A protein has these predicted regions:
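DNA polymerase sliding clamps and clamp-related checkpoint/processivity subunits
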Residues: 1-27, 33-262
Length: 262
């Protein structure tokens, strides 16, 4: 019979707003989120697409910086949060100046005896208790941090280009005006141009003069890109990657952006 049990952690008050903000950001990809808690690292991510991953974003936070954990965990804990947008809205009523705890009721994974699958969560802060039922393990594709680090290593990218902060802000504003869902990213003789068909175009970078390419970017993912002084897009064979200090945003080329994929 599979083992079951509970774990209770305190969420560090100084990290609570950031924790909620990161969860909210992940809901821009999908309304389902997976959190993988291990002794050294906590990874949370969201995926768009079932058989094929169309978009993926994750955050990594050292577990000791997010939770107060008395001892090293002897196992990993996987939490699947369905209806994540509603979950996050509930968490926004937690107050930073109050002690906030998360209690996880779990059972041993059928596929890996070193992992516990969360069955239920209870997050308590002051007068508020947020109760949530954990999703089934098959409802979100499992992503391994080690394999992700290898697969998203920018050393394996083919080429890259940059967009500075002010240009990116203008691109988001221009994109909100016009009706197309798709932005074109064109490279001709090393000049990188982002455009919207029959509406506008903007030259945003100059790279290797011999480089030519044509890519597409769905506007809906502009809001998933974290702000920074310079945003670098790394181009791989089948996807583009925007990497920040504690996050990765992967957007696949292998899609047609049909509405049913959303």
């Amino acid at each position: 019979m599979a083992k079951s049990g509970k774990d209770k952690f305190r969420i560090k008050s100084e990290r609570l707003p950031e924790f909620i903000s990161k969860l909210e950001d992940l809901t821009k990809i999908s309304d389902s989120i997976k959190i993988k808690i291990e002794s050294d690292n906590t990874m949370m991510y969201s995926i768009l697409g079932k058989a094929t991953v169309l978009a993926f974003k994750n955050y990594n936070i050292p577990t000791s910086e997010l939770f107060e954990v008395k001892d090293d965990l002897e196992y990993g804990i996987d939490i699947i949060i369905l209806n994540a947008k509603k979950f996050v809205k509930n968490l926004n009523f937690l107050k930073e100046n109050e002690k906030v705890t998360i209690e996880i009721t779990h059972k041993e994974s059928q596929e890996d005896d070193t992992i516990m699958d969360a069955r239920a969560l209870q997050i308590v802060g002051g007068k508020l208790k947020v109760n949530w039922i954990g999703g089934e393990h098959y409802e979100i594709k499992d992503m391994n941090k080690k394999k992700l680090d290898q697969g998203l290593n920018i050393k394996n990218s083919r080429w890259s280009f940059n967009i500075d902060k002010s240009d990116f802000a203008d691109i988001k504003k221009l994109s909100s005006i016009n009706g197309d869902r798709i932005l074109q990213i064109g490279v001709n003789a090393g000049k990188v141009v982002i455009s919207e068909t029959a509406a506008w175009e903007m030259e945003i970078d100059t790279i290797d003069a011999e480089r030519s390419a044509n890519l597409i970017l769905n506007k809906k993912f502009l809001g998933c890109i974290n702000d920074s002084d310079s945003i670098q897009f790394h181009i791989f064979d089948n996807f583009m990657l925007v990497k920040h200090e504690d996050s990765n945003l992967m957007l696949s080329f292998e899609q047609n952006w049909d509405e049913e994929d959303e």
